[in-house]
């Protein structure tokens, strides 16, 4: 099931995130969006590019910016984290769907938090499209194939991608 929650964070918490990630001081790493064999055939391998800011990996925060995400973590049902990263996809002349994929090879929850509004979206194998609206959080089971896109009406599309465990995935009692 796909769950969409608008105005997910309080305005103050969201404004802090937006300010930090729209500053020129973020340490971005350049990387592929998907493996070349996963990329949508209409997307040139030359356009298989995004900028990434890892926040949480290998069971620990890997960025001083982790603290900005604590309010979001408190609003999810996360009991354990697998990964958090921020993706910056540059504007393209037309919207490209990058290609259907899953983020992990095991069952957990995947979430996308939209940091800016733009004409990009997240699409799912069943045809569902979730528009990129700032301060929106969409969550779904990690076995659901999904695709991000580029955008055409902003300089970039900026999202946070999180993979996490809820109690039901690790046999903990629900509260």
Where are these regions (language model features)?
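Conserved metal-binding segment of the jelly-roll/cupin
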Residues: 91, 130-147
């Amino acid at each position: 099931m796909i769950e969409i929650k608008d105005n997910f964070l309080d305005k103050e918490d969201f404004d802090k995130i937006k300010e930090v990630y729209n500053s020129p001081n973020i340490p971005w790493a350049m990387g592929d969006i998907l493996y070349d064999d996963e990329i949508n055939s209409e997307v040139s391998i030359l356009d298989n590019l995004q900028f990434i800011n890892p926040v949480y990996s290998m069971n620990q925060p890997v960025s001083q910016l982790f603290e900005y995400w604590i309010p979001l973590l408190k609003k999810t049902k996360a009991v354990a984290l697998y990964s958090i990263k921020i993706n910056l996809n540059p504007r393209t002349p037309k919207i490209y769907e990058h290609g259907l994929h899953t983020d992990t090879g095991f069952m957990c929850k995947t979430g996308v938090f939209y940091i800016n509004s733009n004409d990009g979206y997240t699409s799912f194998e069943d045809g569902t499209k979730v528009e990129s609206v700032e301060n929106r959080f969409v969550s779904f089971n990690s076995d659901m194939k999904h695709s991000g896109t580029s955008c055409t009406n902003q300089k970039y599309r900026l999202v946070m991608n999180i993979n996490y465990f809820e109690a039901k995935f690790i046999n903990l009692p629900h509260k």
